[in-house]
């Protein structure tokens, strides 16, 4: 069977605090700088991608799932479009429990080159909807102990989704985040991940970086906030690497 072309990419990890939303925001910004028409969908009821981009919205993902047209719900930010999370999204967690393909149906004719789905840090119905809608998954992993176990658990979930809901789904790559090369632990974790998962691990590593950490408080991507910082350079390289993997599909 031919592999599906990757256009929709879920960013997923059941563990919070691994740089998932930071990656979603900044990957979107640099993919847009590569000339792609990009939509970022904030599926986390906490709305961190939405607030981190300085957007306040009354309507967003929940309203798309209720049948409202996408074009009236998106917000332009730094060269790409954001479909925001709003407080109503908490209710969708219950409503979507029996509808794992609702998001896939709602995004059927979205018209973008690439769609990034920022999933909640849990195996909620919203996360399952993201995995059912995507062709590729990026898994951000913090360079810390237990990283290997966390990735293995998520990959088992991906296999279940592929078997039951979405045979097109595949792992696009594992991304090491919050990396401090001065520590032996970070070096060991990266080495373990590469030894275990091989080419599935992106060559790009996202460093611990003050500018990256502070950018959301200004409502900006790292490309806007500190375009010459190590974090900015890392996400630019990641965007190039993601595009190379997408084009290989």
Swiss-Prot record:
Name the record gives this protein: Chromosome-partitioning ATPase Soj
Kindly list the residue ranges recorded as spanning the membrane: none
Activity regulation field: ATPase activity is stimulated 10-fold in the presence of Spo0J and parS DNA (a plasmid centromere-like site or plasmid DNA itself). The first 20 residues of Spo0J stimulate its ATPase activity by 8%.
Cysteines joined through disulfide linkages: none
Family to which the UniProt record says this protein belongs: Belongs to the ParA family.
Enzyme Commission (EC) number: 3.6.4.-
Per the record, the GO terms for biological process are: chromosome segregation
Task: State where Mg(2+) binds.
Answer: 21
Keyword rRNA processing (UniProt):
no
Say which enzyme class the record assigns: hydrolase
Q: What does this protein do?
A: ATPase probably involved in chromosome partitioning. Cooperatively binds dsDNA, forming nucleoprotein filaments in a strictly ATP-dependent fashion. Can also bind ssDNA with lower affinity.
Q: State where ADP binds.
A: 17, 19-22, 207, 209
Its Gene Ontology molecular function terms?
Answer: ATP binding; ATP hydrolysis activity; DNA binding
Position of the signal peptide:
none
Tell me the domain of life: Bacteria
Q: How does it assemble?
A: Monomer in the absence of nucleotides or presence of ADP, in the presence of ATP is found in a monomer-dimer equilibrium. ATP-binding is required for DNA-binding. Probably interacts with Spo0J.
The residues the record assigns to binding ATP are 15-22, 207, 209
**Catalytic activity, as annotated:** ATP + H2O = ADP + phosphate + H(+)
């Amino acid at each position: 069977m031919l592999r599906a072309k990757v256009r929709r990419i879920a960013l997923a990890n059941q563990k919070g605090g691994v740089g998932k939303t930071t990656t979603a925001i900044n990957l979107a910004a640099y993919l847009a700088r590569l000339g792609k028409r990009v939509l970022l969908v904030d599926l986390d009821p906490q709305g961190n991608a939405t607030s981190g981009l300085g957007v306040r919205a009354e309507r967003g993902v929940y309203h798309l799932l209720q049948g409202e047209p996408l074009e009236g719900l998106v917000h332009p930010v730094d060269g790409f479009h954001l479909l925001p999370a709003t407080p109503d999204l908490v209710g969708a967690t219950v409503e979507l429990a029996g509808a794992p393909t609702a998001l896939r149906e709602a995004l059927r004719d979205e018209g973008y080159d690439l769609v990034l789905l920022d999933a909640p840090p849990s195996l909620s119905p919203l996360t399952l909807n993201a995995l059912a809608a995507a062709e590729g998954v990026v898994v951000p992993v913090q360079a810390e102990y237990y990283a290997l176990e966390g990735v293995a658990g998520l990959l088992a979930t991906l296999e279940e989704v592929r078997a039951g809901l979405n045979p097109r789904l595949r792992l696009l790559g594992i991304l090491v985040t919050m990396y401090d090369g001065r520590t032996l632990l970070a070096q060991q974790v990266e080495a373990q991940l590469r030894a275990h998962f091989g080419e599935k691990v992106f060559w790009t590593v996202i460093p611990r970086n003050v500018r990256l950490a502070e950018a959301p408080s200004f409502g900006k991507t790292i490309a806007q906030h500190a375009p010459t910082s190590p974090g900015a350079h890392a996400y630019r390289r990641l965007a190039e690497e993601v595009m190379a993997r997408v084009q290989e599909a």
